[in-house]
Amino acid sequence: MNVTNEKMRFWSPEVRELEPYVPGEQPKIQNLLKLNTNENPYPPSPKVKAAVETVLVDQADALRLYPDPDASLLKQAIAKQQHLSVEQVFVGNGSDEVLAHIFKAFFIQDEPILYPDISYSFYPVYSQFFGVQTKQIPLNDHFEIVVEDYQQNNGGIIIANPNAPTSIALSLKNIEQILKNNPDRVVVIDEAYVDFGAESAASLVNQYDNLVVCQTTSKSRSLAGLRVGYALAQAHLIAALEAVKNSFNSYPIDRFAIAAAVASFEDQAYFEEQCLKVIQSREQLIEQLETIGFDVLPSKANFIFVTHPAHVAIELAKALREQGIIVRHFNKPRINQYLRITVGTDEQNQRLVNTLKLFIN
């Protein structure tokens, strides 16, 4: 909505200057193949459906009551899955909310926080919103993080691993080096896509008192529609996040979301099966795209980042859209000739490849 300057007089000055995050579009197109927001192509575990039905049918009267503000059952399920204590788990209304609390709790410092110049575009939004100083660290020519670049004065560090939108993962060894180089600052590893082949830093939580790991149920557990994210850290860091949460919204997760997420964590076999299917489809898709001339960055996510030396990325995106296929293009320096493509089912990926062949050939 366009608001005139005259009507903006009611706005807080800070809000007038905000540059909000722009989410991937959710278009209403017939026979749409949606490969632009990294949603899982497979449904959640059948146990999730059963859990939601139980809340709706057997516990409907309880909907008049607020949900558990601590989401205790969910924290217990996450702690069990991650081999941590409940005191080392924080939950929120999607990992974006968890990240917002992280910025508020740890990053308002006298020195700038560090993050890659090409990364999740919510980081600069939160930085502006909370008045956090920032310094963007350029990825190298291969779009990789250079660990040594993060050995400088800072107010904290946040790294998406695997990185978005590049899909490239940082090794656990390199993450540990960043932690060791910054013992007096909080280092946040944002692991929205970690379950598709990268190494999680959750195994380092008990070793480093400056580490926060942020994860989500939206991608690998197919629960993007219910908004459940969480952080893993030592108890003293979790306490700061709880203080921020309870100063903002004491009941961030509803009964349906709690029940669904708990059920998801209780069905590990289904979770692993779906992740493997996405990984296998990703590798097959990469091979198919490389065959028709695309350059594809090495991916450990449920999406790939591709460019074609003979075709303009935005034109390819427009051509795909005309055929009912939506992918993500970022009109930003260094990556404006790339497309981010969510990995679909094998059938969906084949439709994508067949459509691209019409333009490439």
Curated annotation (Swiss-Prot):
InterPro entries noted in UniProt: Aminotransferase_I/II_large, HisP_aminotrans, HistidinolP_aminotransfase, PyrdxlP-dep_Trfase, PyrdxlP-dep_Trfase_major, PyrdxlP-dep_Trfase_small
Keywords: Amino-acid biosynthesis, Aminotransferase, Histidine biosynthesis, Pyridoxal phosphate, Transferase
Biochemical pathway: Amino-acid biosynthesis; L-histidine biosynthesis; L-histidine from 5-phospho-alpha-D-ribose 1-diphosphate: step 7/9
Obligatory cofactor(s): pyridoxal 5'-phosphate
Pfam families registered for this protein in UniProt: Aminotran_1_2
Any GO BP: L-histidine biosynthetic process
Superkingdom of this protein's organism: Bacteria
SUPFAM superfamilies: PLP-dependent transferases
N6-(pyridoxal phosphate)lysine modified-residue sites: K219
Catalysed reaction equations from the record: L-histidinol phosphate + 2-oxoglutarate = 3-(imidazol-4-yl)-2-oxopropyl phosphate + L-glutamate
GO MF annotations in UniProt: histidinol-phosphate transaminase activity; pyridoxal phosphate binding
Transmembrane segments: none
Enzyme Commission (EC) number: 2.6.1.9
Family classification: Belongs to the class-II pyridoxal-phosphate-dependent aminotransferase family. Histidinol-phosphate aminotransferase subfamily.
Assembly and interaction partners: Homodimer.
Name recorded for this polypeptide: Histidinol-phosphate aminotransferase
Organism: Acinetobacter baylyi (strain ATCC 33305 / BD413 / ADP1)
